[in-house]
Design a protein with these regions (language model features):
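Terminal, low-structured helical/coil segments at or just beyond the last alpha-helical repeat
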Residues: 23-47, 186, 195-202, 208, ...
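Structural signature of tandem alpha-helical TPR/SEL1-like repeats
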Residues: 60-72, 93-106, 127-140, 162-174, ...
């Protein structure tokens, strides 16, 4: 066993031991079988420790190392859909879209109902600007798992990029209903990739502001309106007369953004609070 493997096993074992168990004072009473099980958790197998080591490399953003570690495990488990998906995520983080797509396809072939891998394959197609293909993949993922806010968010991005704006708005609202903070999350290194780029940031931020406004979230509405304004979306002042903003338009935070139109906003006069 190599030194790195020993280190990974030791690290995994330490992580597996609950902190409270490590701090529990010594008892002089005879332990029960249950307490013995808590005090002496079963150590991870070398296989489990190897995957955890790779997961740690992903968390550290050491994607190349993580991919290599996952691929070593795949040598003995070539049809492990979860591992295939994780390798795909690692290569996507490295910018190798073709290799990422290859692993996502293998994961889907191994488990045709693996919604995460289908979603991730959709994000690759999105990054390649194949918006129609990405929409189809996101819909397929949602047919398998209707509870994934990230996939709804990704589908909204794809509709937006494809200029299907009403569908984008409807999908964003579904994502927000499941997770109000969905647009504030980073893509991360998990098994489900979240899209983070868009074709027209200013307009996109305006759409997100509108979705939050319809949900009655004034704070986030103001935040995304400001992003839209600062990114150069010249129509951001239309929020003042857009019925979608009616629930939050009088909120001081929203009004503050609308009271300071930038120079590119044209001759529209500064509006007072209603």
């Amino acid at each position: 066993m190599s030194q790195s493997t020993r280190f990974a096993i030791a690290l995994a074992f330490l992580i597996a031991v609950p902190a409270r168990a490590q701090q529990t004072p010594v008892s002089f009473t005879k332990p029960t079988q249950a307490s013995e099980a808590v005090a002496n958790p079963s150590p991870m197998t070398p296989r489990q420790a190897a995957e955890m080591h790779a997961d740690i490399m992903m968390a550290r953003k050491e994607y190349e190392s993580a991919a290599g570690l996952y691929e070593k495990i795949l040598q003995s488990e070539p049809k492990n859909a979860t591992l295939l998906n994780k390798v795909g995520v690692a290569y996507q983080q490295l910018g190798n879209l073709n290799k990422a797509a290859r692993y996502y396809k293998k994961a889907i072939q191994s488990n045709k109902s693996f919604a995460s891998a289908i979603n991730n394959f959709g994000t690759v197609e999105y990054e390649k600007k194949h918006f129609g293909k990405s929409i189809g993949l996101y819909k397929k993922a949602l047919a398998l798992r209707v509870d994934m806010a990230t996939v709804y968010s990704n589908l909204g991005y794809a509709y937006f990029a494809n200029k299907e704006y009403p569908k984008a708005m409807d999908t964003f609202q579904k994502a927000l209903a499941m997770d109000p903070g969905i647009f504030e999350k980073k893509g991360g290194n998990g098994s489900v990739v979240q899209q983070r780029t868009t074709t027209d940031p200013g307009l996109f931020y305006f759409f997100v502001a509108k979705a939050y406004a319809q949900a009655g979230d004034a704070e986030r509405t103001a935040h995304y309106l400001k992003l839209s304004r600062d990114d150069g979306y010249v129509e951001f002042l239309s929020a003042q007369t857009d019925d979608a903003f009616a629930r939050v338009i009088k909120d001081p935070r929203v009004q503050e953004v609308l009271q300071v139109p930038p120079s590119y906003a044209g001759p529209t006069k500064k509006q007072g609070s209603n």
